[in-house]
């Protein structure tokens, strides 16, 4: 079949697009750069008025020019009905009154989405910090609220999503008044690290409306000493929580369906061999209604060290956890026994530390357990009572220990229907056709299986 060369000529096809399309295209660029297109031709001169997103970053060009550019842009778009999102990223220290005037303009114009980020400390006046139209708000870095937030005041009656990244508050009460001032808030994202020096998040989230909560909290040692955690969120459906173990938990999470936990034990306490600190018992009771639970390897260790009584997870259908060669599986048998309706078990890597307390969920046997094996070999394996139908293993490298653990699973999980194994090797690592991947998969396929319905797949 012959091909015809299509002569596109020198026609400017982009300029011939409808205004609405060009406005969408310009909205994808930083506004500083998008404004440069106005010099291309008369066709492009006024297209900036059609953008629906203002993305302003003073890292480009002259600092004074940037401030003047923001003033001119906001004035130019004073009557625009298309702009819905405003993003301001200040790499330099700008005049606080000028920045506040920009933010006030955004609130007055009825924008739907506001993103504020700065590398320096910038004060936000609380007297005008309110909007009836804002749906999404993100505050990052050095922006902080100055003044008092009156309790009971509604600041953002329509706000659905709030993200606070290293945002500092005068005190805990001010933070809670801010959250309470968002009565229909559905999604809250909190990110704090130990670089924060001033008062920040203190472990409290209380809201009747929040449905999704993401927390990454890495407190300084000073703040950790008095660390307590309170989640009073009865409508919460999804929780992603990463922090050090707290001294105490008070939770109301009756609607929770999925939890992703990365709870860590302070390294300085481990290094100093101090007494066990922290208690996750009430936290686990509070999330015992979940259907899906994801655990980091650190969480396994904390559950083992800091939980007095493990609750029964009657609704748990999917359990996922990560392994680490320096952390044992001591708590895994207890988790499996306390999950009577578990259907899917997901494990990221089978390599873990061999201990005397991994129980019969593990095929690894320490020297001490070998001596006691004869007296315990008749004990019922916790895997044999599991209702698990789907087993997902990732990071599988085919070592002798891993193969032994795979055998242990296949021989004891009686209800298995599907096993998905993610092999972590290159398909061909050697010359002369020696396929290591094939040898690993063949070894797994040759393992005996208790369930005749069990099918093994590789990815």
Swiss-Prot record:
LRR repeats lie at residues 66-90, 140-164, 166-192, 216-243, 292-323, 324-349. The keyword Repeat applies. It comes from the Eukaryota. SUPFAM superfamilies: F-box domain, L domain-like. Transmembrane segments: none annotated. SMART domains: FBD (SM00579). Residues 11-63 form the F-box domain. The keyword Cell cycle does not apply. InterPro entries: F-box-like_dom_sf (IPR036047), F-box_AtFBL13-like (IPR053781), F-box_dom (IPR001810), FBD (IPR006566), FBL60-like (IPR055294), LRR_dom_sf (IPR032675), LRR_FXL15/At3g58940/PEG3-like (IPR055411). Keywords: Leucine-rich repeat, Repeat. This is F-box/LRR-repeat protein At2g29930. It comes from Arabidopsis thaliana (Mouse-ear cress).
